[in-house]
Curated annotation (Swiss-Prot):
EC numbers for this chain: 2.1.1.177
Organism for this UniProt entry: Chelativorans sp. (strain BNC1)
Keyword hit for Cytoplasm: yes
Protein name listed in UniProt: Ribosomal RNA large subunit methyltransferase H
TM regions (residue ranges): none
Length: 173
């Protein structure tokens, strides 16, 4: 399933942001909150050259072994990331401030990348091949978070970093 938040194709000087998540997010308050932040990000992003393209949900692998599940899901994530900056949400990733994350997004945009792929792994995490291919790996802290909350937190951080880069007062230091 792919939920689109922007109806335009990426134009010159814009970078597309797309989220690929292993697993489905069921209807409920978490999905509503994530959609609310993603909609805000989609509306605010074009002013600073960022377009939120949408969210793709990748079915969880049904393979028997953990290793094979991670590999199968990882191959799909890597296929989607071709030609773009790949940012993983991973418990082993860097713990960046919102400003630091905004700076990284601006750097990808200004370096000529046309797409940023945000990858959320399945219950078993990311395959080592995906970790090795990532341009950046970030964490929302040392704790383990439920998939639904990670999606909400990512949506809010995307909106927040867009407001930081645009000078909007939503974020306060």
């Amino acid at each position: 399933m792919f939920r689109r938040y922007a109806d335009t194709l990426t134009s010159e000087g814009f970078i597309r942001i797309v989220i690929h998540a292993v697993g489905r997010m069921k209807a409920g308050p978490e999905r509503e909150l994530a959609d609310r932040y993603l909609d805000r990000a989609a509306k605010a992003g074009p002013a600073i050259g960022m377009e939120l393209a949408g969210v793709s949900e990748i079915p969880e692998s049904r393979a028997r072994s953990t290793l094979e599940r991670k590999r199968e899901e990882g191959r799909k994530l890597l296929d989607f990331a071709q030609g773009g900056a790949l940012i993983l949400l991973d418990e082993r990733g860097k713990n960046l401030s919102s400003r630091e994350l905004g700076d990284r997004f601006a750097s990808f945009r200004d370096s000529g990348f046309r797409q940023i792929v945000m990858a959320i792994g399945g219950p078993d995490g990311h395959d080592d091949a995906v970790r090795a291919a990532a341009d950046l790996s970030i964490s929302f802290g040392a704790q383990t978070w439920p998939h639904q909350l990670v999606r909400v937190m990512l949506a809010e951080q995307l909106y927040r970093l867009i407001t930081i880069l645009s000078g909007h007062p939503y974020h306060r230091d």
